[in-house]
Amino acid sequence: MKLKHLPFLAVGAALLSEGALADTEQAVHELAQGCYAIQSSVNGDYLKKFHKGGAIDDGLSYRFEDIQVSDAAHFFFKPTKFKHFLLTDKDGRYLASHLPAEISAGRYAGEFAEWEITAKDDGNGGYGFKFRGTGLDMGLKHNYSDGGLYFFDLLNPNNNDSEKKFKLVAQTDCTPFPEVTTNVTGDVNVLKGDVNDPIRGWADPHTHITSYEFMGGKFMHGDPFHRWGVEAALNDSSEIHGPNGSLDLIGNIYAYNDVNHRYNTEGWPNFPDWPAYNNLSHMGYYYKWMERAYLSGLRMVTAAIVENEVLCWAQSTINPGSWVNPNSCNIMDSIRLQVQRLNEMQDYIDAQSGGPGKGWFRLATSPAEARAIIADGKLAVVMGVEASETFDCGIKDQCNRNDVEDKLNELYDLGIRTIYPTHKFDNQLGGSRVENGFINVGQYLSAGRFFETKECDAHTHGAYFDSGFPLLGDVPFVSDILDIIGLNPTYDETIEHCNQHGLSGLGVYLVNRMIDKKMLIELDHLSADSATQVMDIIEARNYPGVITSHSWMNSGKNGSLHPNTERLFEVGGFGAPYNGNALQMESKVGRYLDIIEQTPYLNGVGIGSDMSGLGGQASPRSNADVDPLTYPFTNEFGFTFEQQVSGNRVFDLNADGIAHYGLLGDQIEDMRQRNSNRVYEAVMNSAEAFMQMWERAEAAPTTKYHDPLEAFVKIFNREANKCMDIPGEDNNLVNGANVQLYKCMDNSYDQQWIWNKEREMFENRADRSKCLDNRGQAYNGGEVVIWDCVDSDNLRWTYTNNVLASKHNPNIVADAYDTGNDGNVGQWEYHGAKWQQWELRPMSIEFKWVDWRDKRSGKCWTVQNGTAANGAKVILDSCAATDAQTWMYDPVKDRMHSALAGDFCMDIPNGNTSDGTQLQIWECQDGNPNQQFLKDSNRFYSVINGNKVIDASGEADGSPIVMWEHHGGNNQKWRASLH
């Protein structure tokens, strides 16, 4: 036997045999991107390709032979994930396996070409390596008596004369695995710095790195990374887009306004038609493209997880390519999957770079963590959510405060730090910024109604709307949807439209809880009213953690910034305009600076790319032909950039614009050379500005919950279980319009009223100039209508103990004549029956002073005798609008506060939840479980015992309020009412 080692290289030249490795796992990780020959540890033979015969893989396989290392197969080690590799020789053949259990020189990447590698210290300063085939889940063995490779041998069951640990000998002449190149040279160590120093570099707060998984994973073609490499990540898109893009219906409509647009779907290595700045349905974030941008000074990005249930449904319905194994269209499922993908991407890049923590792409969940990542010369990635029905709170969903709380906590625990309350469509959190055309069709499919609009105010630029859908009727699948809907909305085509819906009570709760958790609130995509109300909360709570990341807030008139955008900067929030080319960015960044420069905050403005999220990218500069960006160029960090090469395709900013994310690195240099110093410096200060904003948010003092919404109520009839309503769709508020009963609907504005106690009038939300009117008909059969809110007793009412009485005669009260939908509301002499009993139910109850009435009797929780002292008992009593009957529920601390003087809360004596234990009030104590009740729908559960609820022991005045086992009776159901 002749041993053939060069200088002894058990695991690879000087790199792996000098004792620099901390452990055997790191020895495996550091094989990444290496070039090695595989040597027998027993006889020194080397693995070599040979012609074995047969049809599989052209009859080529590998075996050990007594040869020099120069004649051996030299394998490039390409990681697929931690400790797993593809091994390719100089001819591009894979060390592979196939059924039943054979070795071959494979032609394709895949599980049968993937190897899990482990290492063991050989005791001589090196390592022996084991190879386990993923596809067969078997370990590789070498029979050194004949040179053969095998997994199992029926004729040699004891593996005699066999070994399973091998040496790796470093080489320098491997053919690299196919890969996109950054085409950037320089010392990456220059990106490192001191964590206490200001960050130099730019921020992109709006990326969609994982959008390849949204819309069921069947719309955005291409992956930012792939286990089997670029050939799989950026392959031909015809599988989901059809021949020549014929099935890319949504992409063609969005990008080209032409469902019949066609293009070449070929990807790697030629890329004839994609990626392109105006193509919306192909991935632009391949990790090597992102690495080029990172080398330009990109220091942080927000990875906005995007999903839209309606578009997902549409894509999975109309595109046959989506019918096989699509992802779930559920928003929360999609968010969880995309968070998983971001973690996998971090691990994949780490694997390429030599092991955990070695890569340049790092997820960050706090500003301190982000600063440490950046100081280490790496890219900080913050995770956010931009989805239409986050928390499963679409208009059609069953969604309540507990759902929002639980799922907000889940998202936080997943690492999410930024959230858009709305996106594209209205949801139960609030109204979204409205759009005409296809998005309005989606709004109907999502919410069951088209956008409900009003004329924008004097400060707000809105959208023009067409009645019907004149531009969409010829689009095949859209016309089918319109036929199914059978509706054509009518709009005033002469005005600018804004959404009439603002933030909901649930949205108010979300924003406050995000502030409590120091999360960052995104204002883009909110309706103007929603954004105003968010800013009201932000300002009231002195909280700076607010962002506009890609110019999707309403603008002001004549292209000016909206007052809400100005308010955002004035409180210390962060902004980034939607990206444009260098010429466009001068004004886009400049108008943000006009406001920021008047504040005490750092003059930093980011770039919001919104790539691969149904947003087009910057085209080439209009003067690029006469004044091009010249290649190569050296950026301010000393990196030299050549034109980017992906396979056979050369990308040039001057001709291609922002075709993929890597070309943002070229644009940064273009801005450096062509923009004013004011603008360029603001962009290069943007990562620091983002961090300072985030740090201010984390350091913000704890402040009280703030609700900016007016106290709208629904006037609820206890007999009919329906609400006062005006016939029509919030559009029939004319003098004399009859008041009727109808099923209570949270989004029906004409069912919502402001109880103006001073004027004793009920103003209707759909038209605040109209009030509930008794017509002066204080007699049996008198009408109840709406009328202009003039100074007249005809519009005045008194409200006491569930009774709405005419100001003209307190014995004449509002009466439900019929209990069905469209049942008439009139006036009748008081007799006390339930059809004369009305509750003023607030649209939200969190942190509001209300009384609580049981469904059975309509009577109120009452502190007995109004005694403001520890141990005072709680009873049921007729509602009389006293402090003893007034309570405020704190859903954050799960406490019910009494309005009596002092600071008292509902309390279970000694924590005794036995049936019949009477409740009391006691001095409020943080964290005391005796005072904690979970509100679920209309019940209050004790946190001590989830089977016990607050219960009215009787119907008579003075009946004790007790704890009792939940049975679902009406005496355990509680409704809030204003008084």
Predicted regions and their residues:
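Lectin-like carbohydrate-binding module/patch detector with strong preference for beta-trefoil
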Residues: 23-179, 708-979
